Amino acid sequence: MWTVAQLYEGEPDAAGGPSNPAGKLNPRLGRPAGFTAGKRELPTNVYRADPSGRLDVVVTEDQVPDPNGLLFSPDYKKLYVISTGKGPGDTGPGGKGDMHVFDVGPDNKLSNQKLFTDFMIDGVKCGPDGARCDVDGNLWCSSNAGRAVGYNGVTVWNPQGKLIGRIRLPEVVANVCFGGPKRNRLFMAASQSLYAVYVATQGATPG
């Protein structure tokens, strides 16, 4: 194991693919709550790190405010980036709690940015944090709806941005991951619990 690029004190979200070296973030993480934040080493953007250690900005804060979770489509032709909503105690402007999608070109350049979804369901904001793709390109996204009963858990969206399913949980969910020998068990990391359920699909294979 070796360091590709030193970004900051903490572990950023990352997404990798066979022809797309890891996408890296530099969010305001890595410090215990209640303590003064450390000096940010790089602006809050999405960076592409290649094996040589070179960093290229691929998505700016202006394009996606407070970028957080990111993932590729199964064919690595789309990159999805979550804009984290402003949380308690945040002093910055914060994002809108939505998701944007970009086309990934053969040269690894991003283009054609579009709003994928604003995560509004029945007038309730089901803000995301982490997300994963299944083999059909559907996106399984964590849902943080605060105290709105029945809206925390997981939302599922098809590649066109249409809501096609929900998993309701009694807690806010921060992240999700497919696991098990067949990648057909969805693990959901909630505020105080870890939930798991078998689903009728499989998680997309890693790069």
Question: What is each of the regions a protein language model found here?
Answer:
Residues 27, 31, 100-102, 162:
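Noncatalytic, solvent-exposed loop/strand surfaces
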Residues 2-41, 82-94, 144-148, 197-200:
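Short, conserved, GDST-rich strand-edge loop motifs in beta-rich repeat architectures
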Residues 1-2, 7, 32-33, 40-45, ...:
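Beta-rich, blade/repeat-based domains predominating
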Residues 43-66, 103-123, 153-169:
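Blade-edge beta-strand/turn elements of extracellular beta-propeller
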Residues 9, 15, 54, 87, ...:
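Surface-exposed, flexible loop/turn segments at secondary-structure boundaries
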Residues 174-207:
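Blade-level signature of beta-propeller repeat domains, shared across WD40, Kelch, NHL, RCC1
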Residues 135-137, 143, 154-161, 165-171, ...:
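Short leucine-rich amphipathic alpha-helical surface patches
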